[in-house]
């Protein structure tokens, strides 16, 4: 029997935001309740994969395929949405083993599926489960963590199937169709109220850190420690956190920007790049406003994939990473490679500290303290703070207690 989604009008967003159209090769792909459909010339929705019906109270999506084809459906729709760009080929995944159960990418009839999306090869990561690191290439897995974990075992009683879903609307669709048991996505904070009305779904907050990094080796700021400090000193991170706060309703609050009308001479140009990933654009706009208001910089914003050649042109990049300070080893290693810590000598000091940690000569806390000190000296990045991201989890799981254990990891209790 084909799966069907019935969505009450009461659970939909305001009428003004119900349809969000984008032009792709003369076809309009609309988002209705998070489900992509194509509107023909007469405005009627249709899809090669869904029967779409709606009346005054309900919108109904009926799949033309059974559940086993939902992932392929996601691939095909994403293929259309991104103009034949397909999926990212390589990225990193952090995953854990809960209560001795082995979680992997293998398919299993009684598997627990977790949907996730990623904006690049290294970041931003989906922070679902921690402790082990894997490099994923087209669903093949190579472990780069320190502990040995068997990725496929006949003795596994519970397997987690990881679905790579690049499109956020397909992410929601697969969740609604029951193909995924949980979904974590930083595109979701503004959609929390829409979905939390349903008693069948769980929603909560997980932590993702926003970080400004000087990673362009061709930028004059890359080797200019004083210049980096001058730029970072003008960024009001508290104002950015207030801007992103979902509880803040007053539009007249202080953005941390000097609003004086006094005309100042612009002394330096500065380019800032950011991924097309919520809420990066909101953050960089405020950063640009803060820098411009000082009269010392003329910021230019560049939207690009961090790992595309375009990102090398910018002086600063806004990066989203999970739990910068709670999980320092892999995160600081990335930042060290991206920024070079300002000079070769400081980078060598960091690598020496890292080697001592892996050899057991210093503790995790000592490593963290030394890393904070070295990065503070370099002034090559600035943590803005933890952002709000929503995840959704069904209230029923095949194994008793598994939901609570995963929630504890997600919420870092």
Predicted segments, located by residue:
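Short, well-ordered beta-strand elements
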Residues: 2-11, 58-61, 112-114, 147-151, ...
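A bilobed periplasmic-binding-protein/Venus flytrap-type ligand-binding module shared by bacterial periplasmic
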Residues: 40, 64-65, 115-119, 164, ...
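Alpha-helical secondary-structure segments
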Residues: 58, 64-79, 177-178, 198, ...
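Surface-exposed binding/hinge segments that line
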Residues: 53-80, 84-138
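N-terminal lobe/hinge region of extracytoplasmic solute-binding protein
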Residues: 7-56, 82, 88-91, 131-136
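Extracellular/periplasmic solute-recognition and catalytic clefts
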Residues: 143-156, 160-218, 319-324
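Ligand/substrate-recognition segments at binding pockets and active sites
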Residues: 155-158, 262-322
């Amino acid at each position: 029997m084909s799966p069907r989604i019935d969505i009450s009008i009461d659970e939909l967003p305001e009428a003004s935001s119900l349809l969000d159209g984008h032009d792709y090769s003369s076809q309009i792909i609309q988002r209705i309740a998070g489900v992509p459909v194509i509107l023909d010339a007469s405005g009627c929705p249709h899809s090669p994969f869904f029967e779409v019906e709606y009346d005054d109270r309900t919108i109904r999506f009926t799949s033309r395929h059974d559940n086993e084809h939902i992932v392929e459906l996601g691939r095909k729709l994403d293929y259309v949405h991104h103009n034949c760009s397909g999926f990212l080929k390589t990225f990193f995944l952090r995953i854990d083993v809960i209560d001795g159960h082995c979680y992997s990418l293998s398919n299993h009839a009684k598997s627990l599926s977790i949907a996730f999306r990623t904006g690049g090869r290294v970041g931003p990561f989906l922070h679902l489960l921690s402790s082990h690191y894997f490099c994923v290439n087209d669903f093949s897995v190579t472990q780069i963590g320190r502990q040995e974990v068997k990725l496929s075992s006949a003795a596994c009683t519970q397997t987690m199937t990881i679905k790579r879903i690049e499109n956020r609307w397909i992410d929601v669709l697969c969740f609604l169709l029951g193909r995924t048991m949980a979904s974590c996505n930083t595109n979701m904070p503004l959609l929390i109220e829409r979905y939390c009305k349903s008693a069948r779904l769980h929603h909560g907050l997980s932590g993702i850190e926003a970080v400004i990094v000087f990673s362009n080796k061709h930028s004059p700021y890359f080797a200019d420690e004083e210049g980096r400090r001058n730029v970072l000193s003008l960024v009001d991170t508290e104002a950015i956190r207030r801007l992103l706060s979902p509880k803040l309703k007053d539009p007249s609050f202080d953005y941390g920007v000097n609003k004086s009308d006094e005309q100042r001479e612009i002394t330096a140009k500065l380019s800032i790049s950011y991924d097309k990933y919520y809420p990066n654009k909101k953050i960089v706009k405020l950063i640009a406003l803060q820098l411009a208001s000082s009269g010392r910089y003329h910021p230019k914003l560049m939207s690009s994939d961090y790992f595309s050649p375009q990102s090398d042109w910018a002086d600063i990049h806004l990066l989203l990473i999970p739990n910068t300070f709670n999980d320092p080893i892999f995160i600081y290693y990335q930042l060290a490679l991206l920024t070079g810590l300002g000079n070769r000598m400081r980078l060598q000091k960091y690598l020496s500290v890292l080697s001592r940690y892996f050899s057991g000569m210093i503790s995790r806390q000592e490593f963290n303290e030394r890393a904070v000190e070295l990065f503070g000296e370099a002034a090559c990045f600035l943590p803005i703070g933890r952002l709000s991201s929503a995840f959704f989890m069904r209230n029923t799981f095949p194994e008793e207690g598994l939901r609570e254990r995963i929630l504890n990891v997600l919420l870092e209790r």
